[in-house]
């Protein structure tokens, strides 16, 4: 082809898909579509260094913003069991209505049922609020274990960026929780249980059961009907429970004595209301209050007209949102049907490909929804100045440092000796990592494993960037040491609680833990000394030091002729070994104090133990 034309090639392929394309055409197509076009290979390599501090800054900005967003989202999060089902009335109006109604029925004489009903409503509100606080506290402790972060200090507007996220967050949650629980309990329990059971049980149970049912039915029905009728239409539940409780309580309570009314009414009302409300729910339209446009799966299951032979499969598919989305995606994409069929027929061939490493499998199972990304993106945009200031105060990077590179020299790639000489000759003059790139080929500068193995690290000039790069390297070392200490103490605690590892565990780890990642943070000797000390960190450290001393003594004694310095070192090491062996007998809550006593003009060492302040 004299001149390559992609449009013409595409037209020909669409008209006749069986048309063969020449190798030259494919090569031209590849060069036109590939941003990294192929050039003629060169036999020379160039030495260069580059810095990508902008990328490092962006990573830390993203990290700072993500942590702030997670804490902000936790503050605004309300557990599912405390979310409002409906907010038609407030707690105050419900209580006023209840008191006025029962005052008229009891001729202004306070009834025990009035007090118990109010207490039941308040107790329900308190219980749900307490559950919400406990859930948030648990999640907050988990986040702070992984992210030592204070959104009040680092990004103040993290939860004041929107009108509803500002100071109204606390009051809104408090008012919502109160009004929500009030509405749920008041609408359901008051209208259904109070009026129904009050009128029904008083007329039915007569004077013997009046005092018993007044307190029992209110408490029992309040808690039972509250959980069952929470998702049920108020008017429907009221009329249904009214007719049901009249017949049920009348027949049951009439033949039941005062001592058994509590269990009887609780069981009858729970079973009766559960059956009735299940039928009501099946024929009632609901929406997810957190997403009004979406019908919850458990509601959708009840509204579906499913044949008996498909019921088990539909239940399994709609058991979780993930399963439902996966099945729906496969059904809507015909091109996946054959591939999914092949995958299910031969899962062993597909698993190593789709889940090639443990980290890949973990990430593929925890895919964040798109709305989370957009919420996070909005949070970054709305708090950008604060997040930049926080990032610059936490980390030494500045946002105005960009990508830069420098080329030092070009040598022939076949002369490996000359390449090595360049590295060592200029090691005191080059300020950054040195990479060798092949001329005529594109070189990816990302942090790939192959690239990291080719870098040589030299630092001398350019103090500003040098300090930043040194800080980056120091962060890596500190992070590794912190991680190592964390693993060491957790392993010690594990040994204290469950004992040493099983004999076959080391074989299992060497067989299955083969993917790249954090390895060998604790040596074999350290693990053995931890087991020898039964998880006692202090004794394990002494055992480590004893091993070091014994190894040093062994090396010195293996030499034939020791120098004076080596002899002094041998004597010193033996004394350190003896002292370490004595330290093994020191209790954990005490401190050993060496005292020297003059005994007939001869100094003798005595040991004194003093209580340690823990």
UniProtKB/Swiss-Prot annotation:
This protein's record includes keyword Transit peptide: no
Keyword terms, alphabetized: Host cytoplasm, Late protein, Repeat
Induction: Expressed in the late phase of the viral replicative cycle.
Subcellular compartments: Host cytoplasm
Gene Ontology CC terms, in alphabetical order: host cell cytoplasm
Location, primary (coarse class): host cell
Sequence repeats: 161-164, 165-168, 169-172, 173-176, 177-180, 181-184, 185-188, 189-192, 193-196, 197-200, 201-204, 205-208, 209-212, 213-216, 217-220, 221-224, 225-228, 229-232, 233-236, 237-240, 241-244, 245-248, 249-252, 253-256, 257-260, 261-264, 265-268, 269-272, 273-276, 277-280, 281-284
Region (28 X 4 AA tandem repeats of [CNS]-[AV]-[DNS]-[IT]): 161-284
Main function: Plays an essential role in the assembly of the icosahedral capsid of the virus. Allows the assembly of 3 molecules of hexon protein p72 and formation of a thermostable trimer.
Family recorded in the similarity comment: Belongs to the asfivirus B602L family.
The protein's name in its UniProt record: Protein B602L
Organism: African swine fever virus (isolate Tick/Malawi/Lil 20-1/1983) (ASFV)
